[in-house]
């Protein structure tokens, strides 16, 4: 400690400055308040009511002041050796603010009109990758519209679209490698599409026919592909997050040049699995990307009714996780953020949280009518003003990589392929009833065989109550 003391001091101002400098107080008023606390509580001498004046009267010699400063310096610079690091003490009652004065900014590269923002930082994208990103976004939109209408016609039992969130799906997938393991929710079919899942495979799953990899045992849009490192969707919210952390830690142990990636919505952050996953990922330093689609709604619950924090991005810091907020309707920003986050997660062996701000243009699912809790005008505004497809198309057109004819040809081809996939899937035979009881035990136990027998007897007794197209 360096004590900057003069041989004498002639004013209260001098003493205040000396104490403030050497004891580390933020202001002279803090020094005065501290002196009031440490001085004896005997009645002061006449004419010496001010605490600084009283202190001056007790310190006629510089040595006395030096001893006082050293003593107080030691008291004010003690620290607590606590697990995780040293913790400083403060003599003041200080509460951490519930939020920063300004909200965390949102990273974007393209403005609402698809124009490149001046001095924006982004990862360069080749023509081939950019064209595939846009083509897959268009494909996903067409697939969603056709499947949605098929459900409304009674041909599918259920469906949930990703309309308005295509950029999060496709651009994030483009920034990953096939070795990265995906733990999705039910609104990430675009990630699977990017990896090579065919329209026919999507249709087979939605119809639950015998060509479906899940053998008809899952709801529509609950896709999965072992070949493409895409774990099967679970309808239960946020259960995929702890799974992703475990997979990431496994990749770390095996020293793989890959990471785990999990997707979830803003509603998922209200589940305990979200908090458990972030905490263990930070503690174990697992290379996992947490990608949150904050689309404003958890079915009918707006984010304002879910949390009081500044969205989701600040929750990462609470768990010691590096985080970023991104414009989820800007494909170029999503690609750049995920590409950078992936490299960081693998190189530094750490989790990363990405909050992608977007808007759910479609209903939550075919079981929902969102116009009962939000206005049609709000939906229309987002669909036009911040449409992820039109913004990215403007950018690739400005680079000379796209044209109206290319657009027309693509939409015509995808619609034709999608309708054919729908026709084939609908006519393909359903899985055998026996598949309800297989693929769990190597040798089915007696109680499971009894259940299968009971189901068959019930169907034979009441055939009118069961689908006639399921082979027995």
Swiss-Prot record:
Positions of thiamine diphosphate binding: 185-187
Cofactor: thiamine diphosphate
Keyword Oxidoreductase: yes
Binding residue positions for K(+): 234, 239-240
Miscellaneous comment text of the record: Bound potassium ions stabilize the protein structure.
Similarity annotation: Belongs to the BCKDHA family.
Protein name per Swiss-Prot or TrEMBL: 2-oxoisovalerate dehydrogenase subunit alpha 2, mitochondrial
Organism: Arabidopsis thaliana
